[in-house]
Amino acid sequence: MNFTPVREALTSLSRSNAGVASAVLLSMAASIALWMVFPDIDDENHLLEWLQALFLALACTVHGMRAWQEPDRQSLRFLMHAGLSALLFGFLLRELDIDQFGTAPAWAQLEKALRVVELLILIRVLIFFAPRARKVFSLAPQIFSMRITILTAIGGLLMIAGWPFDKKVFHGMPDAYALLGEEVFELGAYLLLFLASLSDTTAAARISLAPNRKAA
């Protein structure tokens, strides 16, 4: 099966502000509309959580593949994609609740093993980042002006927007509405993180993070 047209369409969508905003808002509105007909879709391990996991998995995979395919491992683009892939892998494990997939002990062991893998990946990314930290921080204005950073940051804000619903900050709000609010904001956030992973990062590829070598 040829997925090239789908990939090209998604990439084109990710480059359009109106397209990205429409996709995120439509997904959130559709979730609410579906919930009104099927009120169980926001329960644990139901439709909304599976869609969230799907978008997270796609975002993590795209970032990971782009980092793997980056020819210059000293470029800012490599660090951005590798770091975001590692971060989203952690979010994915948090979202999946693998130990709840079944009663067999193997599920709990699998989740623990994946947590160890996540930790090792994060340590490896931090080891790579440490000698380049000063250079990265000096590039902050450029980094935060990049589309991938802006979309990822907005995705993070949508995740934060769901937090008050999760913690039931709004007193008097029915639990059903609070749960729906949390899941809807997270769905929009994870879709946005996926679209952000498709952003053009050519500018980041031109920036080298190679540590300065001391003169002999």
Tell where the protein language model's regions lie, with residue ranges.
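Membrane-interfacial loop-to-transmembrane alpha-helix junctions, especially the N-terminal start
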Residues: 13-24, 73-86, 146-153
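Membrane-interface helix-boundary motifs at transmembrane edges
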Residues: 10-11, 65-79, 134-146
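Short, hydrophobic transmembrane alpha-helix segments
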Residues: 35-47, 66-72
